[in-house]
Structures are given as C-alpha cells and as structure tokens.
Curated annotation (Swiss-Prot):
Organism from which the protein derives: Christiangramia forsetii (strain DSM 17595 / CGMCC 1.15422 / KT0803)
Domain of life: Bacteria
Function: Catalyzes the condensation of carbamoyl phosphate and aspartate to form carbamoyl aspartate and inorganic phosphate, the committed step in the de novo pyrimidine nucleotide biosynthesis pathway.
GO BP term (any one): 'de novo' pyrimidine nucleobase biosynthetic process
Entry binding sites for carbamoyl phosphate: R60, T61, R110, H138, Q141, G266, P267
Matching Pfam families: OTCace, OTCace_N
Assembly notes: Heterododecamer (2C3:3R2) of six catalytic PyrB chains organized as two trimers (C3), and six regulatory PyrI chains organized as three dimers (R2).
Annotated GO MF terms: amino acid binding; aspartate carbamoyltransferase activity
UniProt xrefs under NCBIfam families: asp_carb_tr (TIGR00670), PRK00856.1 (NF002032)
SUPFAM superfamilies: Aspartate/ornithine carbamoyltransferase
Official protein name in the record: Aspartate carbamoyltransferase catalytic subunit
HAMAP family found in the cross-reference section: Asp_carb_tr
Length: 310
C-alpha cells in the first residue's frame, strides 16, 4: 500500500482510488487511538496554517474539522461568509486570495455551488478539502460513514447498504454511493420517486420503493433527512405521508427478520425520517459516526499536508 495519496486535494470521492481510501482508514486508525488518550494532541502540523471557509451554515462538519486541525497542532483561521466582505459583493477568488496572502497552506471549504472546490483548486496555490459543495459531494462524510461501517461490521466489501430519503438533494448520498461502490459494497436507494434523481441506476445502484423490503435486504441503512431548504416546490403530499411511507420507527425495525445497522449523517429530524427510540437504540451508530469523523478528518488533513511539505 502506498504511503501517500494519489491526489493533492480532496474534492470528491470520485477522484480517489481504493488504495487512497484504505490509506486514509489506516491513518485514521492511528488517530482514533490518539484522540482516546489523555493527551489528545500531536505536533504533526505545527508549521501548517489551515483556513476553514464556510459559505453555508454548518455545526458538526465545521466543529469536526476545527477539532481535527487543532488535534494535529495546526494554526487555524475560521471564516464565516455571514460576517465577511462576501456580503459586500466580493468574489470567491478574491476572498480566498486575500486569505492565502496571509500564507495559508490548506483551505477547507463548504459552498452552496456544486464544483466550487474544483474551481478553486485550479486558481489558488493551496490544498483544498471539499466540506460540501451544494448537492454535489461531501467526501469526508462518506469516508467517515464507510469507516464506521468497517469498524462495526469488519469490512465494507460485500455489505448491502440502503440509503433512504432525499437522494435528489443530498451530497451525502452521492459521495456515499461513490465510496461504497469503490470498496465493493452493494448499494440501493429508497425514497419517494420525486426525490430520486433520474438515471440514478447509471451509478450502479438499485432502486427500492418499499422501505420494509429495502430494510429486509440490507446490512446497513443510512437515513437521510428531507432537505427542505433546497426545495422551492413540494416533492411529496405532506410530512405525515412521508413519515408513513419512509420513516423508520421501532415497530418497523422490530418486525425485521434480522438485525441491521442504522446510520444518519445529521442533523436528525426526529419523528420524520427516524424516531428517537431508533436513533438512540443499540442498532444506531450515529454518535460513533461523529467521533470517527474527527479521526478520519485528521487522517485526510495529515496526508494532504504531507504532500505540501514535500
């Protein structure tokens, strides 16, 4: 296995090789041990400065990246579009170049426009990590999801994973499909027909419209929220109707003929895509995902920073 990534940026899962994912996971294993020690910090990136640029609201992802960076002893700059010159009409390139002029080595960016990270990587001299670009990709979320499956079930290869909910507007769904397929998992999607992208089968995934049938088939169910903030029209009759057809509750979970692993990338809309008694049950690894997110992001940052230092 190579000791370095094949890419200089993490722009999306589709740019990675299986060997890259394996290297990230092996590195994350090491950092998982580190963050469970009494002293959780390592001096690996004392000479690296990282800017977190968030042009969309975020809680878990932003905090997870910031904690990962500080655990690695990097210098961290946090940028919020809401309180910046972006509000005055400043372009993305001008914003980033102003920040890079302060000798920043790496940029972690969330942006509402698909492909923003790709665009940026072609115009600036810094390593770029995509922390979510519109409804396009969210690579570190997919990596931590696969890492959590690997930790729980031993391997991702050969596992059956169903992604349930708003697939159409979800960057998490797309990145997960790419990551899971790359590692040899079988993938199906389940949700209202109006929330499934056209030609989704072209990505090598199956489509199942019945939630119980999908759950009977899978080893892992990744429950996604309905992204109302990305909708300008109604995609289903009512929330009540959605819950009836695609909400996961304890009664449905208990009716299955086997045990499955429940995941959710957050934020959870309790009582909609998943009930509290399922989200808080022993079947769910939702908080494991959050903890693993720090270790996986430490691994990604460390491996990309290693290429900067060369």
């Amino acid at each position: 296995m190579s000791s370095e990534l094949s890419v200089d940026h993490l722009l999306g899962i589709k740019y990675l090789k299986p060997e890259d994912i394996e290297l990230i996971f092996k590195t994350a294993d090491h950092f998982k041990e580190v963050i469970n020690r009494p002293i959780k910090k390592v001096p690996s990136l004392r000479d690296i400065t990282i800017a977190n640029l968030f042009f969309e609201n975020s809680t878990r992802t932003r905090l997870s990246f910031e904690l990962a960076e500080k655990r690695l002893s990097a210098d961290v700059i946090n940028f919020s579009a809401a309180s910046s010159s972006v509000k005055k009409g400043e372009t993305l390139i001008d914003t980033v170049n102003n920040i890079l002029s302060m000798k920043v080595d790496m940029v972690v960016m969330r942006h509402p426009n698909p492909g923003a990270g790709i665009f940026l990587s072609k115009h600036v001299d810094a390593s770029i990590i995509n922390a979510g670009d519109g409804a396009h990709e969210h690579p570190t979320q997919a990596l931590l999801d696969s890492y959590s499956i690997r930790e729980k079930l031993g391997d991702v290869r050969g596992k059956k994973v169903v992604i349930v909910g708003d697939i159409l507007h979800s960057r998490v769904a797309l990145s997960n499909i790419f990551a899971l397929k790359l590692q040899g998992a079988e993938v199906k999607v389940c949700g209202p027909k109006t929330l499934l992208p056209k030609h989704i089968e072209s990505l090598g995934v199956g489509v199942e419209m019945n939630l119980k049938t999908a759950l009977e088939w899978c080893d892992v169910a990744n429950m996604l929220r309905v992204q109302n903030e990305r909708m300008d029209i109604s995609y289903f009759p009512s929330t009540r109707e959605y819950v009836k057809q695609f909400g996961l509750n304890k009664k449905l979970l208990d009716s299955l003929k086997k045990e499955i692993v429940i995941m959710h990338p957050g934020p959870i809309n309790r009582g909609v895509e998943i009930t509290s008694d399922v989200a808080d049950s022993e079947h769910a690894i939702i908080l494991d995902q959050v903890q693993n997110g720090v270790a996986v992001r430490m691994a990604v940052i460390y491996l990309l920073a290693s290429k900067i230092k060369q």
